């Protein structure tokens, strides 16, 4: 798995739980940690993005957003698929909410990793700080508008 996922960012619902298992298994296999393996956590992101959700359990968030029913909860495949749907929803919601700041940028893993560590009240600034240099590198006139 370490070689298969090399260079890939990882996403999990309640990533602190999964991260521990992941790093333990890498160690047991004698594999080095990949610096790209910074986990984005959909629980941390949901706490910042969806304050109106009843809670941040995966099933609750799936119902809250009317995501497809992927089957029995707490089964690896169903939870992974539900998390993927939730991540796509989060990316779409962020793109819509911060369209002016992000312009043509996609919601990248690096931005998600920053947002999950940002206070709810500082999301706007975090996105602006992230997007500014990205936009300037692509098109100087976009960064100044």
Question: PLM features: what roles do these ranges have?
Answer:
Residues 1-49:
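Conserved DEDDh/DEDDy metal-dependent 3′-5′ exonuclease domain
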Residues 21, 81-85:
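Short amphipathic alpha-helical face segments that pack within enzyme cores
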Residues 25-28, 48, 64, 86-93:
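Active-site catalytic microenvironments for nucleophilic, acid-base chemistry
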Residues 29-35, 67-73, 95:
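Short, polar/flexible loop-turn hinges at active-site or ligand-entry regions and domain interfaces
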Residues 36-40, 72-80, 100-104:
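Short, surface-exposed recognition loops or helix-turn segments adjacent to catalytic cores
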Residues 43-81:
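Active-site-proximal helix-loop-helix substrate-binding element of RNase H-like nuclease domains
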Residues 84-145:
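Acidic two-metal-ion nuclease catalytic site recognized across multiple nuclease folds
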């Amino acid at each position: 798995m370490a070689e298969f996922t090399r260079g890939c960012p990882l996403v999990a619902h309640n990533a602190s739980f999964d991260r521990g298992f992941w790093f333990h298994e890498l160690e047991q296999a004698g594999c080095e940690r990949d610096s790209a393996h910074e986990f984005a956590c959909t629980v941390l992101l949901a706490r910042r993005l969806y304050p109106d959700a009843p809670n941040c359990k995966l099933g609750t968030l799936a119902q809250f957003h009317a995501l497809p029913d992927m089957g029995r909860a707490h089964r690896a495949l169903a939870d992974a698929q539900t998390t993927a749907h939730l991540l796509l929803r989060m990316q779409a919601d962020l793109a819509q909410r911060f369209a002016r700041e992000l312009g043509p940028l996609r919601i990248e893993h690096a931005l998600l990793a920053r947002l999950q560590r940002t206070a709810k009240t500082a999301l706007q600034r975090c996105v602006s700080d992230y997007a500014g240099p990205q936009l300037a590198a692509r098109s100087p006139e976009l960064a100044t508008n």
